[in-house]
Amino acid sequence: ATTLAQIAASELGANFDDVIVRTGDTTQFPFGMGTGGSRVMANSGPAVAQTAREVKQKAQAVAAELLEAAPADIRIERGLAFVAGVPSKSITLARLSLAAIKSKALKPLGEPGLNACTYFYPGTVTWAFGTQAAVVEVDTESCQARLLAYAVVHDPGRTVNPIIVEGQLQGGAVQGLAAGLLEELVYDETGQLLSGSFMDYAIPKCDDVPSIDVALTEHRSIINPLGVKGVGESGAIPGAAAIVNAIEDALVDFDVVLREGPATPRRIWQAMQDARRRG
């Protein structure tokens, strides 16, 4: 919601704090497929941008009528509409929204009021690219692996909000390291789940997670007009593989090969025994 509000405020010329994003209300928005699949910014973002531009066009027409100027000469910044070069004489967007109800300037556009509804249909998905690297330490006696450092490099296309993007990638990376080192659904021979509580299902704790460094490299997408790419899933996907590869590298002298995760001490010990048997 934060990034969508940023886009709306930027395109319209409104103050960010004045933008309210309503989500999940099926009485107002019956059409939608949810927020999964790394598609919020890639799909919803362009629709929000186009809608804000249409509202801005209407606001400029109303402001031009009130300020006795051409719509092309109207600027809207920080929630104020004014004639270019004369910012001292301005009208708030709130006042314009009231004036728009009766404004004759909107007659050619078909309806009164500062409102718009648009849809964006992407031609295909926006592929995001990235990589992750882990530094681990393995105790060859206890077969315990410990994560020492972690880094993420990701291409989000255009970064609308770097803090949110980095946070998503870091949160996803924690999920990935959990899959690589800790979390596992364990069943007995009858199919009974044995790791069904936090007593048995190991989730990452603060001391399991090192500082996660994030670097963003921007290569804008050509699939949507904002140039954005998905981020939500990208942080979680490479983690387990990065950690297992790091463990294999740490144990390269033992010729260890790990084919299954998470890399628990039991699995690492078994992999070391298998390597010894292979000679």
Regions found by a protein language model. Name each.
Residues 1-279:
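Cofactor-binding beta-sheet edge motifs in enzyme active sites
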